[in-house]
Amino acid sequence: MRFFCFGMLLPFTFVLANEGLQLPLETYITLSPEYQAAPQVGFTHNQNQDLAIVGNHNDFILDYKYYRSNGGALTCKNLLISENIGNVFFEKNVCPNSGGAIYAAQNCTISKNQNYAFTTNLVSDNPTATAGSLLGGALFAINCSITNNLGQGTFVDNLALNKGGALYTETNLSIKDNKGPIIIKQNRALNSDSLGGGIYSGNSLNIEGNSGAIQITSNSSGSGGGIFSTQTLTISSNKKLIEISENSAFANNYGSNFNPGGGGLTTTFCTILNNREGVLFNNNQSQSNGGAIHAKSIIIKENGPVYFLNNTATRGGALLNLSAGSGNGSFILSADNGDIIFNNNTASKHALNPPYRNAIHSTPNMNLQIGARPGYRVLFYDPIEHELPSSFPILFNFETGHTGTVLFSGEHVHQNFTDEMNFFSYLRNTSELRQGVLAVEDGAGLACYKFFQRGGTLLLGQGAVITTAGTIPTPSSTPTTVGSTITLNHIAIDLPSILSFQAQAPKIWIYPTKTGSTYTEDSNPTITISGTLTLRNSNNEDPYDSLDLSHSLEKVPLLYIVDVAAQKINSSQLDLSTLNSGEHYGYQGIWSTYWVETTTITNPTSLLGANTKHKLLYANWSPLGYRPHPERRGEFITNALWQSAYTALAGLHSLSSWDEEKGHAASLQGIGLLVHQKDKNGFKGFRSHMTGYSATTEATSSQSPNFSLGFAQFFSKAKEHESQNSTSSHHYFSGMCIENTLFKEWIRLSVSLAYMFTSEHTHTMYQGLLEGNSQGSFHNHTLAGALSCVFLPQPHGESLQIYPFITALAIRGNLAAFQESGDHAREFSLHRPLTDVSLPVGIRASWKNHHRVPLVWLTEISYRSTLYRQDPELHSKLLISQGTWTTQATPVTYNALGIKVKNTMQVFPKVTLSLDYSADISSSTLSHYLNVASRMRF
């Protein structure tokens, strides 16, 4: 329902700026709907009176309102919009000063509402006017709080001339603890020096604890296209994605008090902290500084993934530190719960066409710190410009827990973008690697004035460049390389990238001096290379699962050193012996390394040819087999044959039913089995549980052997120790048993035979250095047999009987070949089936009670020794590397102790119930068997 209020009606028409769209406006000076019966002129445009819009169950709509001063629809001192179940809409309202829809002289609170929307509101009936404040296209307030709303909040197509295309607050704005999403889209502030296309806050803006997604998109202004917050901006503890995209800061008119920029946002202190689903800055534009963010200080920590994609500016494609005001700027980027990614951000300050790729541009004395926690990365597919003087060193992996990776890569640079600026990060001050990994890959380069490796690993991939650069003592001075030094003490080579097609060896280079178009050797810098040289992959893991290492390799280029005639690169302490030391998984082999040194004549027209000393480190590889990572070894798959064997033996137990009475009988049994296989000899054990049912028929007579036939179906689950690997199985069992007595019933002989088909699904979860999961389906076949001999005493009528027995058990299991899917997928096929022949020997005692309810108690104790065993083995192959190995099962002890207790109760003349428990105990295995059976004779 729409609420229309009566009052004085004045026709009015205005032209929406830059749209050419004429909208008829009706001017209302009205009351809130509840006061329509007794209107008070001017109540809704009184800056000294509070106003509340609360508890509406129907839609509340104020549209096409105009007021001659502030607040096109409402003007008040404090405004509360709360607990409205119906939608709240402010649409197409206009005023010539501030607050196109709402003007709150002090505070505005929007809380606990369902959907609320501010659309197509405007300040100024004349878009060319410059007089007046012209602030807040939708809303003006000294302080504003948008909190605890349940539905969607929408601020779309609002327009102001100076500040706050949609929202303007003189001091603080809080967007906090909202359950529904918030959309701030296509709002504009039009003047050339306007601020905050979507939001303007005169002091602080907090976006915290929201459960719904926040979208700030397609807004524009002179500076701070999406957001302008004068002092602080905090985006923290939000549960859904925060998106700041497609915003534009169009001003390029610098002034003494105007330094425009920030296509996405502009502020002094920006904190982006603990946002679970991450933050996205995409396709924001600035005609001046900082395509995504223009801020003096930025802290990005403890978030999910943070993306800076496709942003563009004149300086600082993604980020630029604001140089105005007192104090020094600092950028702290820490990938703690997700990666931080810079890709396809561009800048144009050097008037390149097309613009060159750039992630960060620094102004003087910026403090830049970049790091990543284990398993996470800060990925720079765009270079950094840290050229202006700073007393603060750039710190890579600056905190104790930063053992992750900071990567510079040219992987995504278009093949036509050949200019060096698309690949090189210029670090013209001091840089330090504290710990973790600093990786340079795919043609990217670090040009450093001073670089010190205090710890961690410098990982170099194909085409990577580490080179010298001059420093700039003052912003207006010429770069100088005097004092330039690079110290490296632990280099790793990304071997898979070096082995890729047309790969180039990573290069350590003293960059030549350029005068005009002439290049000459630069003898000022020094480079020291020492410590160990190791081989890794791009994830800083052993690279030996590469398929290339399955065969011999010759003349693999590992490292290229480009020195000057004065020999300013010292690599004499580089230790190459570590290439063949230590253990690793994957392909095994031996590296043979050698240097090739060349002295050339300087070529002043060639950037690379200007230097005259060239050294290339080559290596040859001789393979010697394959060793799988323990998580890939796969004994859990082989152990499936043992799990099926235990289940088949449980099925055999259900076939034998010794009964002195003759006739026919049928039984229905519920069966359970719990097996605990211990770890042994470095192989992981497992824990499995099985439940199922069995149906058997029996025929007994005094003239012929007893015969029983049974069918069973079992369901089992198994889990490997110390991992999340699991198997679900479905077993189909059938068997028969023949019993007869010999030597005047002194000996009872029984023969049991069984076959079981098992369908299995396995799920492997990788942890530690390996991540991901794989799954596969397979089946196996199990044959089981038992030959049992029981020595029966005479006479039968005794209530207590004790007699020995001996049994021969045989098991054989086969597994069909199968292939996994997913991460680290493997292929398995049978190498040797499981074969086990054992001999349980023991004593059985039975006691009969012929009272009111006849009972029979049976106990057994036995010792089982294995006569012959062939442990199962599988042929295993890692598909990604084609590495092969043999997978064994977890060892099972050859001897075990067996205990059994069974109680049979005759509940009716022809019906018995029984409960049977048995356990097998050994140093490797503990199993518990339980059988509940009901048997009827015919």
Swiss-Prot record:
Residues 1-17 form the signal peptide. It is a peripheral membrane protein. One of its GO terms (cellular component) is cell outer membrane. Its main location: secreted. Transmembrane segments: none annotated. Pfam families: Autotransporter, Chlam_PMP, ChlamPMP_M. Keywords: Cell outer membrane, Cell wall, Membrane, Secreted, Signal, Transmembrane, Transmembrane beta strand. Residues 659-938 form the Autotransporter domain. The keyword Secreted applies. It is found in: Secreted, Cell wall; Cell outer membrane. Belongs to the PMP outer membrane protein family. This is Probable outer membrane protein pmp15. It comes from Chlamydia pneumoniae. The lineage of its organism: Bacteria, Pseudomonadati, Chlamydiota, Chlamydiia, Chlamydiales.
